[in-house]
């Protein structure tokens, strides 16, 4: 039995299949964890959704920002982004089933026994693991059982950008979503920045990657995340595993076997340059 983590798919189905073949993934014994953004700019988002869903308990994803946007478009709240290639999903006979399944995926997966946690973008510098779990559950409860359309319609904002336990209502939920699905850089006072997407060495001096801020959690638990393609080949601290290596940006898809920390890579199999 082996445990595998894989970076953002973004509709790059063929590359995922190559990786699964390379490691001889066996769904009867192995486990596959995905850091979110199953869909968007690649041309096989439908196939990615179907595959992960079909693996049942052998696979577990978390929600990424593109997954949440797909939910918002599915419920008529937002329009499909011009660069996203998700039309096949909306015309699929299993559309409603796929959207229902996606809406019931978590924002965070924590394995206390193996001491790792997985989210799409990261964990707030102001949270411990208990707070992170509780915050994830707050949003998940609304998405799965509450007024999810209202939440999806109100999540598109960058405020508030600083955590407070006193946050309530939609502002609290929005901050939680932004941390788990959009966060990259922060200011040193822990405020979130959503404008800078550049490589770390080209970022403004006042910004720092969230994982370089002071939070005891970052040294206590292994954190696996994706979302940040421009981090590719950038060294990260011990316990921090960044798996988005920009396959849809003509780079590569990365898979990590947890037991021996061996990486497997699959270069992009086609030119996705139209997404630039």
UniProtKB/Swiss-Prot annotation:
It catalyses: P(1),P(4)-bis(5'-adenosyl) tetraphosphate + H2O = 2 ADP + 2 H(+). InterPro entries: ApaH, Calcineurin-like_PHP_ApaH, Metallo-depent_PP-like. Its EC number is 3.6.1.41. Keywords: Hydrolase. Gene3D superfamilies: 3.60.21.10. It holds the Pfam family Metallophos. GO terms for molecular function: bis(5'-nucleosyl)-tetraphosphatase (symmetrical) activity. Hydrolyzes diadenosine 5',5'''-P1,P4-tetraphosphate to yield ADP. HAMAP family: ApaH. PANTHER family: CYTOCHROME C5, PTHR40942. Belongs to the Ap4A hydrolase family. This is Bis(5'-nucleosyl)-tetraphosphatase, symmetrical. The lineage of its organism: Bacteria, Pseudomonadati, Pseudomonadota, Gammaproteobacteria, Pasteurellales. The gene is apaH.
């Amino acid at each position: 039995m082996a445990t595998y983590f894989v970076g953002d798919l973004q509709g790059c189905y063929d590359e995922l299949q190559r990786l699964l073949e390379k490691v001889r993934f066996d769904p009867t014994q192995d486990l596959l964890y995905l850091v979110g953004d199953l869909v968007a700019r690649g041309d096989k988002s439908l196939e990615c959704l179907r595959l992960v869903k079909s693996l049942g308990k052998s696979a577990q994803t978390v929600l990424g920002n593109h997954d949440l946007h797909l939910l918002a478009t599915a419920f008529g709240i937002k329009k499909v982004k011009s660069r996203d290639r998700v039309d096949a999903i909306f015309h699929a006979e299993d559309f409603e089933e796929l959207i229902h399944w996606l809406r019931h995926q978590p924002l965070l997966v924590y394995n206390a026994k193996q001491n790792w946690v997985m989210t799409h973008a990261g964990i707030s510098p102001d949270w411990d693991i208990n707070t992170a779990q509780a915050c994830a559950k707050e949003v998940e409860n609304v998405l799965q059982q509450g007024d999810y359309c209202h939440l999806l319609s109100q999540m598109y904002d960058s405020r508030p950008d600083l955590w407070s336990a006193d946050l309530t209502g939609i502002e609290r939920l929005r901050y939680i979503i932004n941390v788990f699905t959009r966060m990259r850089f922060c200011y040193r006072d822990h405020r979130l920045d959503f404008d800078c997407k550049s490589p770390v060495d080209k970022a403004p001096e006042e910004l720092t990657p969230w994982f370089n801020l002071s939070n005891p959690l970052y040294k206590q638990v292994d954190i696996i995340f994706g979302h940040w393609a421009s981090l590719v080949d950038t060294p990260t601290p011990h316990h921090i595993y960044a798996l988005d290596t920009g396959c849809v940006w003509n780079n590569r898809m990365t898979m990590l076997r947890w037991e021996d920390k061996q990486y497997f890579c699959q270069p992009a199999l086609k030119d996705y340059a139209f997404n630039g």
